[in-house]
Regions:
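Conserved beta-loop-alpha segment that forms the PLP phosphate-binding cup at the N-terminus of a helix
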Residues: 41-45, 67-69
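Short, contiguous, pocket-lining structural segments
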Residues: 7, 36, 40, 63
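Surface-exposed, charge/polar-rich loops and edge strands
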Residues: 1-35, 46-57, 78, 90-174
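Extended, H/D-rich, highly charged conserved domains that either
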Residues: 60-76, 80-86
Length: 174
């Protein structure tokens, strides 16, 4: 999904439509308005976590999106500490250290509320589209929509349909 001069909104819509039409996404449906929970997210999470740049990190900030749940689960199972934004307290995070914390519904029971993501070494944000230069296009609003700007490396997960050589519009974050 690419072309000439395209707005970010038009590119998001094109990606969402292709994912829906080709049935390459899972709950929540429809994918429009979300960072899609794409088929293959678990494999993408495994690949990212095993990448040499990521393997050295022990503490991550990870978005709350459903597409990132496999990454949260795998990271917690391998002993990483995660900070996930608190859904009801803006600016707060859940500090998570056990696999039960991968699910948003379990975070209040197993997580520790924290104001700052202490010791975080990298960020993983969900996306609607990404490019090979590191550009990321989120859903256009909400937590992490424009990146976090914490001076930490930021990563994302994407289905090949969501990935292009270069975004046809300005990236939300890089």
């Amino acid at each position: 999904v690419s072309g000439g001069e395209v707005t970010a909104g038009a590119h998001r819509t094109a990606v969402w439509d292709v994912l829906e039409r080709t049935r390459l996404c899972s709950f929540p449906f429809p994918p429009q308005g979300h960072c899609p929970n794409f088929n293959g997210a678990r494999d993408a999470a495994k690949n990212l976590l095993s990448h040499p740049q990521m393997a050295a990190h022990r503490t991550l900030i990870v978005g709350p999106e459903r597409a990132l749940m496999p990454l949260r689960k795998l990271a917690l199972q391998s002993g990483l500490t995660l900070y996930v934004p608190h859904q009801k307290k803006e600016g707060w995070y859940w500090r998570l250290t056990g696999p039960l914390g991968a699910r948003l519904s379990q975070m209040p029971a197993v997580g520790e509320p924290r104001l700052k993501p202490e010791g975080a070494q990298a960020v993983v944000l969900a996306c609607v589209a990404a490019d090979r230069q590191g550009g990321r296009l989120g859903k256009g609003y909400g937590w992490g929509a424009r990146g976090l700007h914490l001076g930490l490396p930021e990563y994302t997960l994407a289905h090949p349909i969501m990935l292009s050589a270069q975004l046809p519009c300005a990236a939300d974050s890089t």
